[in-house]
Amino acid sequence: MKYLFIAIILILYCSFTKADQKKFLVNMYDNDPLFSPDFENANGAQTGLVKKKLGSDGKPIPANYDMKDPNGNYYIKNATTFKSWFNEVAGVSILVPFELVLTQTAGSQNYYSYSNTSFFPLNELGWYNPSIKGDYEFKKYQDSNKKEQNFHFCMHASFIMSTNCKEVFKFKGDDDVWVFINDVLVLDIGGVHGVQDGTVDMANLPEKIHDSTNSKLGNCKNGTYPFDFFYCERHTKASNCLFETNMGFTCSYYDYCGICNGKGECCTDVKLNQCYTKKCPLPNSLPNGATNYQDYMTIVPTNTCGGTDKCKIYSCNNSTGCEFKQKSCDDGDKCTKDACDSKTGYCSNIPTNPSVVTSCLKSGCDSTTGNYSTPTNCDDKDPCTIDSCINGQGCVHTKACDDEDPCTTDSCSADGKCTHTAIAKCNSDCPSCPSKKCKITSCSEDSGACNYVDMVFASPSECYKATCDPETEEAIYSPIDSSCDTSDSCFTAQCNLNKTCTRVPAINCDDNNECTTDSCSGGSCSNTAIACDDNDPCTIDTCSPSEGCIFTPIVCEQTSLCNTFTCSVGKCVPTPITCSSSVKCQDSICREGVGCVYFNRTCPPDDDCSSAYCSMETGKCISKAYDPLPFSCQSTAVKVGVGIGAAAAAGIAIGGAVAAGLAIFGGKKAYDTWKTSRGNVMTGSQSNPLYTQNQNNGNNPLYSAPAE
């Protein structure tokens, strides 16, 4: 009798309960061994084929290339072949949308499952679509029942889940399966293999899925996360895909392709020419769920045509692509050497030779001709002097009318004419007197004796005294003050009124470059590069010949919609963007390639016998036991049919199917007690047809009249 009761209870439960469904449009990618060597290789199960974090495109990244099984078969040949697994690649894989229908598990409100032991969703689709197949001759593959099937495909299903770290996801099937939560790998069943199973237990995750540093949280933290399910069928002769979960999968958005949390993969960028591309819009950017993405495509540059040589000016030619011309640093000065620094792009215009200034020479450069060396002009405009320049002293102006006759007086007129007037009683026939170094010889008219007078030389300035060189009888000019010493050829001395000198550069070593320190030593110029270092690793230190040191902050390229990149210790470091909402019961999350998305909060229940919702008053989740409870949540007494009436009389909450069992086996009183405990939803016992009196005045054997 007990077993009959249980059977009736189950029959009634199933008949009174309509299975709920959740439908999600996901992406399938049809491959074929004709194009991809990764398919139809019997290489066995293998973990570690993909990295533990999803790539920036939200797809797995292969971790081992050229890895082979003992028979020499590839697991994954290379990154190029792997790309077609979860991407549409022209001539290799074809994108096909697929409706994944999850069915509520019988006897449980919170569990949903998918079960297919003959999982061939792409038969007559993808490469096997007659309109696409064309002239390709595909090998025909059969299952164990000799039926032709499309075995070679992959699937990516993306959901959003809210967790309190109690949920589970159970999978059973073949071949590759990878599950990522918040982009972190939590289930790895890779390789071509027979049916295998695996479980994601949120309470015991193998990897940390959150960023909190609180060690007490473990690998799971209550919150909302993306859930990505990657599946591949890569080999004959069976295809199984079964999973069950109480993770409340939802979609944060649908892209314009209709895909749950999709990346807009039905849209393909169109290359217009060598320089411009018509780019697809962001997956969730169309207004009001529109699907006409073609109207929202934008034209963007295909090639930035940049290069490492900053002395080249790059541009793009629509026909030929990138081209460049050399940057001009010509300053129009023929006395400079023009150059461009390929690392910085700065121009330098360095003098070809430094300007040399001495007492008698100005070695400058004529910017229009490029000619050098200009003698010092010592012309004093006096016709009565002979103008010359003595190196180290400068200009010397010697009287022009000296006839070297001791018996004449020499003079010069304003027009430069010399006059030599004889000196009276001067004996020019004086006997020959022996010469003496640095002496002027004369003879006395009266005595005929030789007279010697020291040679006197005119000094070029008040700062020098002139003496006679006893060897050459030429003038030697010595500085009166040490400040007038010109032994260093890098300087010349400028005489002051107080008979001291001011040292001024004799050689111009300025190379017109703010990036060098200019100096002179031993008559030679030195131009030493300065060090531009501000000790900040987040600046690019360069030097401009016209401006000197320039410290340019490193600007990090913003390549992500979910991270902001800033410089730290010389590297661009991502900081996650916080997507927050002030609207109660609205959740938010950031998806790479999409940005921030906002959606109604889904609350995880406390257990499998409860449902949860978000309170619009508090914005917090509230978990509440199902009423009536699902059969699986009933007490043992109810499940086995022991003491049914007592259970109802005791006020145990039970469902309609069990209530029907009570009506059959527990008697009307038990049923009435259950009905009363339901809050008088029914108005009377007559609401149950099993307890309605026979309208033909006959006896209903299951009906007992109310006690008087």
From Swiss-Prot:
It is found in: Membrane; Secreted. Residues 20-643 are extracellular. Its main location: membrane. Keywords: Developmental protein, Differentiation, Glycoprotein, Membrane, Secreted, Signal, Transmembrane, Transmembrane helix. GO terms for biological process: cell differentiation. The keyword Disulfide bond does not apply. It comes from the Eukaryota. InterPro entries: Fibro_Slime, PA14/GLEYA, PA14_dom, Prespore-cell_inducing_factor, S_mold_repeat. Residues 682-708 are annotated as: Disordered. Acts as a quorum sensing protein regulating discoidin gene expression during growth and development. D.discoideum is a single-celled amoebae and switches to multicellular development when food becomes limited. As the growing cells reach a high density, they begin expressing discoidin genes. The ability of psiF/dicA to induce discoidin gene expression when present in conditioned medium, suggests that it allows cells to sense their local density. According to PubMed:15947191, it is secreted in the conditioned medium. However, prediction tools clearly predict a transmembrane domain. In some conditions, it may be cleaved and secreted in the conditioned medium, which would explain the discrepancy. PANTHER family: PROTEIN PSIB-RELATED-RELATED, PROTEIN PSIF. This is Protein psiF. It comes from Dictyostelium discoideum (Social amoeba). The gene is psiF.
